[in-house]
């Protein structure tokens, strides 16, 4: 049957499925034949004994308690339950029955004889049935019991023989089938054509395999060359059969892709030009999305079929090449020189087919990667969203590693192509160089070169050699670029593996941290529960003890009233106030000088016991500067006396007669005095510049003019306080002068930082004169002073940058992090690889 018929001719053909009546296993059937006197027909019953035994065995096994418990076990997988339910629902029929007259049995016999002619003499002879008016007047002829039993026995034997000859499927369809389904017997022409293409491919592959097996028995080079020609023809037949098969398989998907693109174009034109309502536009957009999905699925199917096609062709080409490599070991170099050209051709063909296969795989992996990225970006919030995101990212990393392997194989195939071309060109160069040319005899070399034909031939040979050498250099440069690409891919693969392992480690650490936090939380909950249990137990014990105490000592608890408690507290407060008025009033004040670093600090006068806090605060405001270090002294402190020779403060003690005689606790030890300064030289004294730092003190004259009431007014006078303040200032200035004489500039800087004052010197800007012979564009300092011009950023770029900001949603943040890791693990862009100076190699 030809597979190139037109569709109009194909409509007149019907294809029957092969082996449609073939039985997978033998079964035992039993026929029971009896005469029905009421109907006047034979009742034929058939039982499938094999199915009946299986059913009874299943029922017996199902009644056992162990089997029933295993069937009802909740641990049984739902997939297994779903698989067993339809099997139980679609139980095989075990019995069939029907009524057949003599005429019906003759019709059945004719159908069975058309299948097998052996059944023609086997049908028993039935009595003739009257027809027409005679059957109405006289009725059917009556049969005796012996005749009926004899006919029944013969009919059983006939049915058994028909079962053995025709098979159960044909016999059951003839006897007991109610209606025939043509789809069960007939085959569609497209399926038939597909099967025809596959059979053609199998025949071509079998022929090629037979020729490859002949290499083992071929020992002569001439026979081997003839075998090579047959192999080339067989391989071309394999390629042709594979192309026909996959062109037929690709055609529906190509039609779907073209139809989807055409329909999408029509929808786009309709939306842009027609005046449609919002519902119609929405329905058209939905239809456009459906067609886009169909086109995408068609493209994926086309890519998968393309990969399968190149797998078949590359496998066949590689088998031929490997067999020829094995033949090379059996022959010497001189004998094998006749087959070198075919070896180079096969090597080039294997590399080319493998290259096309790897490029098809690369396209498929890229599509899968883009699909995974789209799924990541379209994830919605949910309980399992983060887990799904991690799974998609792991799949993306696996596809990326596979893509690196495929790209590495692509570069290897390109390198093999270049190597094959280089070997071929180098062989041509060596042949042209070693070629022996016989010339006519000449008296000298100049006379030979003087002829035009000879000079032209030599020039042509040189030009050809130069072209071949130039091509060799170009191919070597391309091979170098391929090596650079391989190194780049190797580095990217290592980065991808590192990122993937880092992500796995982070996931493990996060899981461990989560488990640790969960264990800690459970431990805290157990501890709190234990504490609450202990508290409740102790409370119960206390209540039990109180209850026992009340039962043992009833009526002995005395409670005081609120009135009695208030009177007792009032009495205690009066006693405390009288004791405080009888106590002598005392006040101690400490004054301590600080160095230059603490000059800005303040001194505080703190009383030990005062009755009037208002007068104490007034005294503190009108006295020494605040924030000084204070200490409680047992006696009243008078103003210290300072001299220029001795910079340490001297504390003298003043004991007025009004103070009590009981000594208070001893004062804390004073800090050690500073070391004496070195004597300054004359030069230092002459050039010494004393800068007095005026620290603004917030003092109020009114506070100083206010009279101090009570015993504090007897301690200090305002003139004494002013003299003490002046003395402290002079002491701080002199001490600072001596410190400047012996300190370094860094000490002065630190001292100024402590004081909080800075003396900055204004420096005039110096403009260096430009060099006379130097251009301003080449001067780096001039360019730096001139500044950098900033470019305006477009709003779209700003909007895109803001959209990439981390979101508060954990799922969105996880998606952004996953995409960032994917971008780092993947190659930067396709343009980066294309930017390398590599042109396509010539065929």
UniProtKB/Swiss-Prot annotation:
Predominant location category: nucleus
Keywords noted in UniProt: Actin-binding, Coiled coil, Cytoplasm, Cytoplasmic vesicle, Cytoskeleton, DNA damage, DNA repair, Lipoprotein, Membrane, Nucleus
Region (Disordered), start-end ranges: 49-91, 518-537, 558-632, 652-688, 821-843
Example GO biological process: actin polymerization-dependent cell motility
Polar residues bias locations: 66-76, 582-596, 613-630
Coiled coil residues, start to end: 190-225, 359-385, 416-487
Annotated Basic residues bias: 562-574
Gene Ontology terms for molecular function: actin binding; microtubule binding
Domain WH2: residue ranges: 776-793
Topology versus the membrane: Lipid-anchor
Cellular location(s): Nucleus; Cytoplasmic vesicle; Cytoplasm, Cytoskeleton; Endomembrane system
Entry superkingdom: Eukaryota
An example Gene Ontology CC term for this record: nucleus
Bias kind Pro residues: ranges: 661-680
Acidic residues: bias regions: 827-843
Function: Acts both as a nuclear p53/TP53-cofactor and a cytoplasmic regulator of actin dynamics depending on conditions. In nucleus, acts as a cofactor that increases p53/TP53 response. Increases p53/TP53-dependent transcription and apoptosis, suggesting an important role in p53/TP53 stress response such as DNA damage. In cytoplasm, acts as a nucleation-promoting factor for both branched and unbranched actin filaments. Activates the Arp2/3 complex to induce branched actin filament networks. Also catalyzes actin polymerization in the absence of Arp2/3, creating unbranched filaments.
Family: Belongs to the JMY family.
Protein name, UniProt field: Junction-mediating and -regulatory protein
Lineage summary: Eukaryota, Metazoa, Chordata, Craniata, Vertebrata
Gene that encodes it: jmy
């Amino acid at each position: 049957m030809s597979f190139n018929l037109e569709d109009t001719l194909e409509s007149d053909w019907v294809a029957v499925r092969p082996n449609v009546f073939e039985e997978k296993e033998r079964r035992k059937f039993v026929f029971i034949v009896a005469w029905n006197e009421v109907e006047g027909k034979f009742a034929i019953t058939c039982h499938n004994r094999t199915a009946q035994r299986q059913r009874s065995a299943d029922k017996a096994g199902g009644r056992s308690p162990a089997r029933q418990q295993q069937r009802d076990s909740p641990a049984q997988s739902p997939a297994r339950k779903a698989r067993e339910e339809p099997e139980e629902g679609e139980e095989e029929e075990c019995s069939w029955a029907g009524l057949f007259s003599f005429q019906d049995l003759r019709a059945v016999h004719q159908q069975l004889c058309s299948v097998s002619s052996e059944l023609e003499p086997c049908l028993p002879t039935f009595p003739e049935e009257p027809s027409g008016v005679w059957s109405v007047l006289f009725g059917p002829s009556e049969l005796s019991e012996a005749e009926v039993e004899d006919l029944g026995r013969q009919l059983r034997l006939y049915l058994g023989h028909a079962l053995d000859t025709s098979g159960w499927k044909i016999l059951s369809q003839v006897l007991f089938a109610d209606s025939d389904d043509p789809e069960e017997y007939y085959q569609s022409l497209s399926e038939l054509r597909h099967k025809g293409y596959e059979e053609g491919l199998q025949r071509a592959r079998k022929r090629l395999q037979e020729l490859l097996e002949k290499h083992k028995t071929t020992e002569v080079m001439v026979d081997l060359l003839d075998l090579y020609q047959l192999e080339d023809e067989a391989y071309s037949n394999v390629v042709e059969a594979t192309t026909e098969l996959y062109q037929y398989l690709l055609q529906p998907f190509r039609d779907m892709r073209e139809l989807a693109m055409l329909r999408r174009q029509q929808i786009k034109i309709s939306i842009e030009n027609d005046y449609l309502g919002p519902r119609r536009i929405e329905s058209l957009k939905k239809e456009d999305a459906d067609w886009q999905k169909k086109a995408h699925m068609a493209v994926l199917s086309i890519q998968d079929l393309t990969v399968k096609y190149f797998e078949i062709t590359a496998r066949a080409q590689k088998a031929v090449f490997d067999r020829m490599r094995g033949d090379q070991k059996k022959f010497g170099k001189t004998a094998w020189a006749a087959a070198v050209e075919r070896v180079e051709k096969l090597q080039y063909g294997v590399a080319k087919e493998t290259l096309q296969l790897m490029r098809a795989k690369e396209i498929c992996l890229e599509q899968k990667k883009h699909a995974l990225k789209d799924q990541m970006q379209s994830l919605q919030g949910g309980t399992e969203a983060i887990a799904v995101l991690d799974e998609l990212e792991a799949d993306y990393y696996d596809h990326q590693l596979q893509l690196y392997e495929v790209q590495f194989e692509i570069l290897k195939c390109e390198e093999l192509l270049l190597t094959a071309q280089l070997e071929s060109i180098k062989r041509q160069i060596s042949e042209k160089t070693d070629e022996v040319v016989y010339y006519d005899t000449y008296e000298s070399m100049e006379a030979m070169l003087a002829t035009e034909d000879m000079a032209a031939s030599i020039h042509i040979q040189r030009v050809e050699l130069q072209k071949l050498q130039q091509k060799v250099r170009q191919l070597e440069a391309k091979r170098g670029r391929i090596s650079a690409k391989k190194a780049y891919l190797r580095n990217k693969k290592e980065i991808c593996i590192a990122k993937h392992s880092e992500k796995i480690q982070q996931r493990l650490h996060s899981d461990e941290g989560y488990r640790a936090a969960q264990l800690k939380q459970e431990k805290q909950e157990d501890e709190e529960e234990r504490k609450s249990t202990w508290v409740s137990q102790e409370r119960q014990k206390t209540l039990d003890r109180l209850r026992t105490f009340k039962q043992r000592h009833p009526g002995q608890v005395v409670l005081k009233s609120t009135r009695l408690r208030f009177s007792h507290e009032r009495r205690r407060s009066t006693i405390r106030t009288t004791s405080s008025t009888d106590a002598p009033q005392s006040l101690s004040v400490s004054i301590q000088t600080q160095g230059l670093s603490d000059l800005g600090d303040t001194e505080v006068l703190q009383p030990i016991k005062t009755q009037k806090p208002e007068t104490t605060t007034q005294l503190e405001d009108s006295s020494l500067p605040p924030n000084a270090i204070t200490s409680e002294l047992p006696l009243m402190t008078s103003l210290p006396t300072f001299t220029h020779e001795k910079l340490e403060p001297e504390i003298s003690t003043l004991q007025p007669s009004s103070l009590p005689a009981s000594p208070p606790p001893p004062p804390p030890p004073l800090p050690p005095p500073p070391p004496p300064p070195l004597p300054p030289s004359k030069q230092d004294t002459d050039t010494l510049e004393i800068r007095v730092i005026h620290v603004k003190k917030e003092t109020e004259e009114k506070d100083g003019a206010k009279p101090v009431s009570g015993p504090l007014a007897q301690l200090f006078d305002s003139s004494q306080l002013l003299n003490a303040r002046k003395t402290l200032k002079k002491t701080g200035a002199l001490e600072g002068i001596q410190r400047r004489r012996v300190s370094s500039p860094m000490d002065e800087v630190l001292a100024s930082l402590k004081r909080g004052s800075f003396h900055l010197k204004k420096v005039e800007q110096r403009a260096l004169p430009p060099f006379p012979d130097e251009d301003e564009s080449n001067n780096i300092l001039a360019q730096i002073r001139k500044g950098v011009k900033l470019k305006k950023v477009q709003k779209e770029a700003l909007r895109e940058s803001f959209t990439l900001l981390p979101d508060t949603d954990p799922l969105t943040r996880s998606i952004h992090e996953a995409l960032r890791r994917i971008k780092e693990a993947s190659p930067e862009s396709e343009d980066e690889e294309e930017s390398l100076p590599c042109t396509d190699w010539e065929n």
